[in-house]
Amino acid sequence: MEEKKETAQMTQETTPKDSRVIEGVRRSSRRSHAEPHSPKKAYEVRDRRQKRSLERDQHEDGTPIKRARLPREQSSTRKHPIVLLSREIPEYHTETMPTPKKNYKLIPEQVTELSEYEIERLNNIKENAKFLQSLKLLETASSLRSPPKKQNQTRGIKREKQTKVERQPIIRRSMRLQRIDPSGAPLPNVIQPPEPLLEEHPVKPPGPLEMVPTNLKGDCISVEEFLKTWASTSKESLRSLKKQPSKDFKRYTACLQTMTLREETVAKVVQNRIFSVAIHPSESRTIVAAGDKWGQIGLWDLADLSGNDGVYVFEPHSRPISCMSFSPVNSAQLFSLSYDGTVRCGDVCRSVFDEVYRDEQDSFSSFDYLSADCSVLIVSHWDSYLSVVDCRTPGTSCEQRASLNMRSARTTSVHPVNRDLCVVAGAGDVCIFDVRQLKKKAQPVLSLTGHSKSVASAYFSPVTGNRILTTCADDYIRVYDSSSLCSEAPLLTAFRHNNNTGRWLTRFRAVWDPKQESCFVVGSMARPRQIEVYNESGKLEHSFWDSEHLGSVCSINAMHPTRNLLVGGNSSGRLHVFHD
């Protein structure tokens, strides 16, 4: 007992006065490694263990030690819980004991002792947190973040949101045996004929249609002002058309470098994919037109700053408008041709779309002016027919119709000097016909060879007609010499060009520039998106591109006849106007 008292006094001297002692003892059922074999030794071992346990659970004066069990979730196992043994703390320890931290709760009978290492670790954590807070890293990171990029505001008409159609659940039972329809009504005994299906885009009625915009509701003042502007600019354009095209090629290429695209010269003009583009020949006012997939014609006056951004949408057709042109003689008239089998003339002076030619049993593909005064048209049909239409005669029929020895007729172009000749592009062949020899089964005067796939377009050069430009699906653009059409038209240039637009883009159609008939413009599949200008030798003269405002493929393009102005239309109904 004296030895135990001495060891207790030594432990009290080494233990700091300002700390409380909590001992954790895990009850264990471990047996000793050396088990006695005799019963007498076994009893002696048992007595020694009981004596040690009694001494461990009592104070020196014989009072029992209070026990505190940890909660079940804090104990490692249910079989061996951790027991905290707390000794009664003398009175002189409470005065010198340090105040506990906020995160620790002091139990009257239990106090957790922290080692010097743990106290130093907590102090280091606090100092590191204060140091990181003094650096202000979060404020610096938030200030370095770039501001959100401003989105370009969409000009013109807005995209219509399609309403979602909720589908009714399918009832898994026999309606036929119950003699009821899907709505639950009893079926009649007499079988009635099915009701005709309503078309989403019905065919327009025959006869003239009024020029009433579909994107404006009740705003008659702006419509009247636009029509007056169109009529007044048409009178001025007659003088500008008399100018001859420029012969200075260096000056022409220099002007191409000055043409740029701006945010205010991009607008959505129609709702769907653009199939044709036309430019008003006025030099004082910029008016462009676009025809889309479902018969809409969008007219855009770039100088009009009204609430509709100068965009006026009309619906004279019900199917794709594949060809459209302002009359070279009277620019107050806009001719349009559609797949629905109609050719109409939009007369701004009378505010109507007159019907020039109608054939409901057939589908039209293209047209051109056969006479110099633009009173006679030649129309190509998809099923390989040519029709001659005189706009001066009453009615909506044609004067002459001939079947071509071709699989189809996609485009037709009249020779600008010898107007009895026209070139027709079809499915794999390009032929030149003499209109005077058109019969029920017309034979071509000349055929242009070398095309291995379908030809999208073929056009005479706009001034002399000495060149023929073709765009083919075999990824080639070809230029033929048509100065002498007696025996053959030799191939001058054939260069590779990616014409594989796919299903959802309008096919490329390379067209001549009226200001420089040795150059032509065509869309491109290259990135960044661009519109390309080539000369007749196949050399790339210039590429129009703008990474900020031009982000799509412009399949259909057109050049102004006298001004440095280019218009490109894409498959979402937008027009992009490049000008100096």
Curated annotation (Swiss-Prot):
Database matches in SUPFAM superfamilies = WD40 repeat-like (SSF50978)
Keywords associated with the record: Repeat, WD repeat
User: Record's superkingdom?
Assistant: Eukaryota
Enumerate the residue ranges of region (Disordered).
Answer: 1-82, 142-165
Positions with biased composition (Polar residues): 142-155
Gene Ontology molecular-function annotations: DNA binding
Cite the record's Basic and acidic residues compositional bias ranges: 15-76
Q: Where are the WD repeats?
A: 269-310, 316-356, 359-399, 404-443, 450-490, 500-544, 548-580
Can you quote a single GO CC term? nucleus
Query: Do you know which Gene3D superfamilies this protein is assigned to?
Result: YVTN repeat-like/Quinoprotein amine dehydrogenase
For whether the record's keyword set contains Repeat, the answer is yes
Q: Which GO terms describe its biological process?
A: regulation of DNA damage checkpoint
Which Pfam families does this chain map to?
A: WD40
Functional summary from the UniProt entry:
Specifically binds 5-hydroxymethylcytosine (5hmC), suggesting that it acts as a specific reader of 5hmC.
Q: Which family does it belong to?
A: Belongs to the WD repeat DDB2/WDR76 family.
This protein's name: WD repeat-containing protein 76
Which organism was this protein described from?
Answer: Xenopus laevis (African clawed frog)
